[in-house]
A protein has these predicted regions:
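N-terminal secretory signal peptides that target proteins for export/translocation
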Residues: 1-7
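Bacterial N-terminal signal peptides
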Residues: 8-23
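Sec/Tat signal peptide C-region and signal peptidase I cleavage site
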Residues: 23-29
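Cleaved targeting-peptide boundary
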Residues: 29-35
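Extracytoplasmic/periplasmic ligand-capture domains
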Residues: 30, 73-74, 97-99, 103-139, ...
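N-terminal lobe/hinge region of extracytoplasmic solute-binding protein
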Residues: 39-93, 222
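Residue-level recognition of beta-strand termini and adjacent short loop/turns
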Residues: 92-94, 178, 234
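Non-catalytic accessory/assembly modules
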Residues: 140-163, 167-197, 201
Length: 596
């Protein structure tokens, strides 16, 4: 999830991670009596970090697996820091070579595969993990993030030819210099690569574990992180418990400009982490059920969804009843974008003929973002026209969309390009058959409201709507196969740089993160040029051109960036929502004496 400007390389190299490891593995600090109860809004898809893409599965992976890098818990804006690495990487050759030194004495969680013997983490584990992204059998949605490693293209091509990826083959771009040192060489300059290795997806796995559970690696996560998966009822409940092999981390961070940091430091300074012994995650797809569970003290933290914001947060502050009960609010702006795309490879709506582009743009022109924020978001969002959100390097607050709400213009476009209305008032294809737009959404009450809003929008321009209902994991599966025509989707920053958002439209990422399966050679050439550039006015200019090309071709309609309102029960100590980190429970505590 993140980004790095060239002038900051030296300072990053000098940075030290505030969560320093203890000199020897301590007695487990986590207290089994400290149980954190949280919820996921949609179902997880699994826990093989190379294979998952969604926010919820990645949250669990972040608690179980350890990437080489991470982020400082308190620093804002997000600040890169070592995790399994001893220090920041040594970067050379114009950011084409990265060398990581791995901490000694890190061990994987117990598993029968290890035959009761301690299994230490080594540089070879990270080399193996990186190779897994390029194995065609894994179909990793994050393959492109590791696509720049020198020599892996050839290994992948041979795997496609033979049907088997050769993990033992020497690769120029992945050199294990010694047991604890990994050198990565890239084909091109990449100032963001250290941020890529902070992704939860890049957490180290043990080869013997993957091979032992090859039939279902999503169900058998074994990592070196602070937690282990001890129970999983798919789409229902996930239970994590503290990893007894975890080395322990000492809580120490410098305060940011946030006034609340002083209180957090007073409560947490010097504690051995993690403190929480058990994390129970319930899948609660309906907003009302989650809200009631929090009110009944069945949840310790609630990501308050839009439906109940007017009740819980009058004037964006907790209501009097919640305040009396000691409930507090953590409110931030998410580094995310929310948008509706149209699949440009669809046989009916796809392609780049002028009439198809006009049709897609007309559909987007019919949709009123202001109404969407008022009705669906209940005011808990900011209208956003640019695909790089506030707080992320490359955001352009001055950008104005060429597909604003304008149903009059939409109707003129449709009339001009021959999408005429029949006697029933609905439009037809130029060949006379009914024109029906297909849209996918989940069965949740919020999505039903969104269906109605799209129905209302399309009625303005005389287009019929067919809504296909799918659970979220099935939507993702179909989307990655370029089988969905359209969906309202979200992308939250993997790392705080605009590249993480621009890669959503890169042609070769179709089948991964390019939901619209948008492929345009001119766009791809310009994007690849930006990949080798640090943050600069020139890169920002190219980003603006790239986004304009996406809008001109009727690929996507930007909607908003959300406020994230987290309600905290009084027993939650030291919590701070991070813009990039997902499993914040690694860094905060529970005080059972404060439970109601």
């Amino acid at each position: 999830m993140f980004g790095i400007a060239q002038p900051g390389l030296v300072s990053l190299l000098a940075a030290a991670f505030a969560l320093a490891p203890l000199s020897a593995p301590p007695a487990l600090a986590a207290d089994p009596a400290k149980v954190l109860r949280i919820e996921f809004y949609v179902a997880e898809t699994g826990f093989d970090p190379v294979k998952v893409q969604d926010y919820y599965s990645q949250t669990v992976c972040e608690a179980i697996f350890e990437p080489l890098m991470t982020y400082d818990y308190l620093a804002r804006p997000a600040k890169l820091a070592p995790r399994a690495a001893e220090a920041m990487p040594v970067i050379s050759d114009q950011a084409r070579t990265y060398v990581f030194k791995i901490r000694k004495g890190i061990y994987f969680a117990p598993d029968p595969v290890f035959k009761s013997k301690p299994r230490e983490l080594t540089a070879e584990d990270y080399a193996y993990t990186i190779k897994r992204f390029r194995d065609p059998a894994n179909k990793s949605p994050y393959e492109s993030f590791l696509g720049g490693v020198l020599g892996l293209d050839e290994v992948k091509k041979d795997a496609e030819r033979t049907g088997k990826f050769d993990y033992d083959r020497k690769v120029e771009g992945l050199q294990v210099l010694d047991r604890y040192t990994l050198q990565v060489k890239l084909k091109e300059t990449d100032y963001n690569f250290a941020h890529i290795l902070a992704l939860p997806n890049t957490g180290a796995v043990a080869r013997e574990v993957i091979e032992a559970y090859a039939d279902d690696t999503n169900a058998h996560p074994v990592g070196t992180g602070p937690y282990m998966l001890t129970e999983w009822k798919r789409s229902n409940k996930i239970v994590l418990e503290a990893n007894p092999s975890f080395r322990g981390l000492t809580w120490h961070f410098e305060p940011s400009a946030d006034p609340g940091d002083k209180e957090r430091i007073a409560a947490m300074e010097g504690k051995t982490m993690p403190q929480i012994g058990r994390v129970e995650i319930s899948i609660i797809e309906e907003q009302q059920a989650a809200w009631l569970a929090f009110q009944n003290n069945e949840l310790d933290i609630l990501y308050l969804r839009e439906q109940f914001a007017p009740v819980a947060l009058p004037s964006n502050q907790v209501n009097a009843d919640l305040a009396r009960r000691g409930v507090t609010l953590s409110r931030t702006t998410d580094p995310d974008i929310n948008y509706t795309y149209i699949n440009t490879t669809d046989p009916e709506f796809g392609g780049f003929a002028r009439d198809k582009i006009a049709l897609r743009r007309a559909i987007f022109l019919s949709f009123d973002n202001a109404e969407y924020i008022r009705v669906i978001r209940k005011g808990q969002a900011i209208d956003e026209a640019y695909p790089i959100p506030p707080g992320v390097i490359g955001n352009d607050p001055t950008y104005r969309s060429i597909v604003p709400y304008d149903p009059q213009l939409a109707n003129k476009l449709l009339d001009y390009f021959g999408y005429s209305r029949g006697e029933d008032g609905y439009r037809r294809w130029p060949n006379g058959t009914p024109l029906v737009w297909r849209y996918s959404s989940t069965p949740s009450s919020r999505d039903r409201e969104l269906d109605e809003l799209w129905q209302k929008s399309l009625e303005r321009i005389g287009i019929r709507l067919r809504v296909d209902k799918n659970r979220f994991p099935e939507e993702l599966k179909q989307e990655r196969a370029c089988q969905l025509l359209s969906r309202t989707a979200s992308w939250i920053a993997d790392y705080p740089d605009g590249d993480d958002f621009m890669q959503l439209f890169y042609g070769p990422n179709s089948g991964e993160n390019n939901s619209a399966c948008f492929q345009l050679a001119e766009w791809d050439r310009m994007y690849l040029k930006t990949k080798t550039m640090p943050d600069s006015p020139e890169r920002s200019r190219l980003y603006r051109q790239l986004w304009r090309m996406v809008e001109v071709n009727g690929v996507l309609k930007m909607h908003d960036t959300r406020y994230r309102n987290m309600l905290l029960q009084p027993q939650v100590i030291g919590y701070k929502k991070h813009p990039i980190l997902l499993a914040e429970f690694i860094y905060f505590d529970i005080d059972n004496s404060r439970r109601r």
